[in-house]
């Protein structure tokens, strides 16, 4: 059963950083282990780190300048010219460097095993095997300028957004490269980024208008403007499933916007219970909620991609068994109150 509660736009966070902090921000990638954000900067050629307090520091300088970012494990992979480079998210050490012979790699995503990257200028999509340090051309010609790309684990497809007037949205099979048109003409010009929110909806960032637009998972319902203000050429967006935020780099004014949405019951943010925590954390086997719950409480567990991996009801003082979860970061949502708790599984 897929958990699909109602969605409520809560607030526009004060996510605009000082202009000096960013220089051509292109891509934001949420790091769930560090609970922070990695931001590629095409102007300075740097990948920067923004923590939850708003402090911005440098992780590493990349040449050619970094565009799309994607994290697998402890490595952040960056589109850099005609290749992909991987850096330790701990200290910025270069750990992977593979050329695909591309022209201008722009967007990047992963299905957990392979990387998939768009070549904006050549109109191609490449599939990169990190373990084997090899690649193949998945799509030799998309017939346009592919930009943002995201792996859809529910539909088992690559969803790609395109540059240009009345831009299209297409899906591609990760094994054969076979294409399916999801939206032939969006009415949007220059779609830069795409991500998936906590409800399985697709969010796309366009330059004209400057907007974040939501599509339902089937792409059959009318598109919805999220109403995010202050955007200026929004680029390669991401969704922070732990904190429920759309992460938006504004390449036009050197800022990053965080727009928070309610992924659970529609309870206003200021009425949510923020006093509870998971103990112990990180954990390997059994955890408990502190302070104890007052009554039987339904819950769901979501992974960093927003996928439902567990659900049930917790009674007061009950222990939650997390032994079957794979190593990684998860969000435990108490659906009755909207409380979101971060869990790190060792």
Feature-to-residue mapping (PLM):
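Bacterial Sec-dependent N-terminal signal peptides
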Residues: 1-24
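A short beta-strand motif characteristic of beta-propeller blades
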Residues: 21, 54-61, 93-99, 134-140, ...
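Beta-rich, blade/repeat-based domains predominating
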Residues: 22-34, 42, 62-74, 78-81, ...
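Structural signal for beta-propeller blades
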Residues: 45-48, 84-85, 123-125, 166-169, ...
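Short loop/turn segments that connect beta-strands within beta-propeller blades
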Residues: 50-55, 88-93, 129-133, 173-177, ...
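Residue-level detector of functionally pivotal "anchor" positions at catalytic/ligand-binding pockets or at interdomain
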Residues: 261-279, 285, 307
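Short, glycine-anchored, charge-dense loop/turn motifs used at functional sites
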Residues: 301-309, 330
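C-terminal tail/sorting-segment detector
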Residues: 311, 327-346
């Amino acid at each position: 059963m897929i958990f699909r509660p109602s969605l409520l736009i809560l607030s526009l966070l004060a996510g605009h950083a000082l202009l000096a902090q960013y220089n051509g921000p292109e891509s934001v990638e949420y790091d769930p282990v560090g609970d922070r954000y990695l931001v590629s900067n095409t102007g300075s050629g740097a990948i920067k780190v923004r923590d939850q307090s708003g402090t911005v520091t440098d992780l590493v300088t990349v040449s050619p300048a970094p565009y799309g970012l994607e994290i697998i494990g402890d490595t952040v992979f960056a589109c850099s010219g005609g290749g992909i480079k991987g850096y330790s998210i701990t200290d910025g050490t270069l750990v992977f460097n593979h050329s695909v012979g591309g022209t201008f790699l722009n967007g990047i995503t992963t299905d957990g095993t392979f990387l998939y990257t768009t070549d904006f200028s050549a109109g191609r999509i490449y599939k990169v095997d990190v373990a084997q340090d090899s690649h193949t051309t998945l799509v030799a010609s998309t017939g346009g300028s592919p930009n943002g790309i995201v792996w859809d684990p529910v539909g088992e497809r690559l969803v790609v957004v395109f540059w240009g007037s009345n831009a299209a949205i297409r899906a591609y099979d990760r094994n054969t490269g076979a294409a399916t048109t999801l939206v032939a003409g969006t009415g949007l010009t220059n779609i830069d980024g795409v991500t998936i929110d906590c409800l399985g909806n697709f969010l796309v960032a366009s330059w004209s208008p400057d907007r974040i637009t939501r599509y339902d998972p089937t792409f059959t319902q009318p598109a919805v403007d999220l109403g995010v203000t202050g955007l200026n050429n929004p680029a390669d967006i991401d969704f922070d499933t732990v904190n429920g935020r759309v992460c938006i780099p504004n390449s036009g004014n050197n800022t990053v916007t965080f727009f928070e949405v309610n992924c659970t019951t529609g309870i206003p943010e200021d009425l949510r219970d923020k006093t509870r925590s998971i103990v112990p954390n990180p954990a390997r086997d059994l955890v408990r909620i502190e302070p104890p719950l007052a009554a039987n409480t339904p819950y769901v567990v979501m992974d960093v991609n927003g996928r439902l991996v567990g659900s049930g009801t917790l009674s007061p003082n009950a222990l939650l068994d997390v032994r079957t979860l794979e190593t990684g970061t998860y969000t435990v949502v108490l659906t009755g109150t909207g409380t979101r708790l971060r869990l790190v599984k060792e």
